[in-house]
Amino acid sequence: MTAITISDQEYRDFCRFLESQCGIVLGDSKQYLVRSRLSPLVTKFKLSSLSDLLRDVVTGRNRDLRVAAVDAMTTNETLWFRDSYPFTVLADKLLPEMAANKRPIKIWSAASSSGQEPYSMAMTILEVQQKRPGLLPSVSITATDISASMLDMCRAGIYDNLALGRGLSPERRRVFFEDAGDGRMKVKDNVKRLVNFRPQNLMESYSLLGKFDIIFCRNVLIYFSPDMKSKVLNQMAASLNPGGYLLLGASESLTGLTDKFEMVRCNPGIIYKLK
């Protein structure tokens, strides 16, 4: 029987490794998360215990195992149109404001996870184009994630009924999806065409991504240390065009982390504009 217990020291060593690789800070009480996320890899890589797996990951003995472990710890499924208001603000304020500049609008979804956020953006753009023909110039979305398996899932754009039921209205399901068989639905090509998925570790340089007018970095900073949060936010400020906007998660704040943005109160919600 495979042992799935780990010692406090093994947990601390793995936490240091994970923070060094992708900035995620687990804290003192997330052993259960490590066990649940990494235990399947013990069998997959034919190891005798979770302790052996953690040792091989931390020492770098097996590169494929390292990649799989980071992938498992950074994989999160999210909701369609999460919190609702960011997409209302995108449709009613940000897109019309950016359209006045008469140049292509570039948007970055900085942690695309299983694809719901960037595809929700794309649906919002298509809805604005339908309601206000001719308003928008070309709009493109760059969606990034550290997880290779999540990016593969995003590009496929196929979701089961459970995933589709998390925040997606029946009307949007009808308009923007097509049947994929086996009770699953696939994002239509006109939605997919707006989104380009790319790998990106938020601890590394963003310069190759180019400049953006709008950045969604929602429910990501909560996993990082204060120093890492500041580094990410200052890099994102440098990645925005003049007058660009940053949208964070509903419970996230810039307080004490960067002075590059000014708060903008919307109805509803709060967003941040580059100074």
Swiss-Prot record:
Pfam families: CheR, CheR_N. SMART domains: MeTrc. It comes from the Bacteria. Keywords: Methyltransferase, S-adenosyl-L-methionine, Transferase. Transmembrane segments: none annotated. InterPro entries: Bact_Chemotaxis_MeTrfase, CheR_C, CheR_MeTrfase, CheR_N, CheR_N_sf, SAM-dependent_MTases_sf. S-adenosyl-L-methionine binds at N76, T78, R82, E117, D145, N201, L202, R218, N219. Its EC number is 2.1.1.80. It catalyses: L-glutamyl-[protein] + S-adenosyl-L-methionine = [protein]-L-glutamate 5-O-methyl ester + S-adenosyl-L-homocysteine. One of its GO terms (molecular function) is protein methyltransferase activity. Residues 1-275 form the CheR-type methyltransferase domain. It is an enzyme of class 2 (transferase). Disulfide bonds: none annotated. GO terms for biological process: methylation. Methylation of the membrane-bound methyl-accepting chemotaxis proteins (MCP) to form gamma-glutamyl methyl ester residues in MCP. This is Chemotaxis protein methyltransferase 1.
